[in-house]
Amino acid sequence: KLTQVLYHRYKAGKKGIIMLACELIDNNGKELLKCVNQYIDQWGLDDGFRKYVNEDCTFCGSLVDRIVPGRIRDPKEVAELEQKHGYADPLLDVGEVFGVWVIEGDTKLNDVLPFRKAGLESRVFVTPDMSPYKKRKVRILNGAHTGFVLGAYLAGFDIVRDCMHNDTVRGFMNKMLHEEIIPTLPLDKK
């Protein structure tokens, strides 16, 4: 569908657009561009369109980490949400609010994307290289979850939120983070 949308924009003489790839795979922006180019080949689309895609459009990689555990199974909670919002959603899901979204691209994107205007400059970052952010995310977030999950599960906890409300589990995780995980990162100590 994306290739079709871009092709229609190209044929209509519209300027290129910015794509923010959010798939949780390495090099997601480059992989998305690769997919579009593969469709250009498969469908025999013209070289002018290929040039438009590769030069006028921007394919940014990004790092978004958001835990989406799945459907809400408690009928009472579903009913409360349906009442609150005024409609029934058969695909109702729950997800944690993510704290940071890192977009890999030219920092000039800050002038085009509306994140600053929305007051999100402390939560959305545009950077030419997101690899340091990925390393931090993988080690800190995934390391913390991996490090405390077994003990938390044995203590009877099923979700991260409940673990963080428990002083013992939260204390263990914080100690592990500060003594074992964060020292392995090339971070500014501030």
Where do the protein language model's features map onto the residues?
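Substrate/ligand-engaging "lid" and interaction regions
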Residues: 1-190
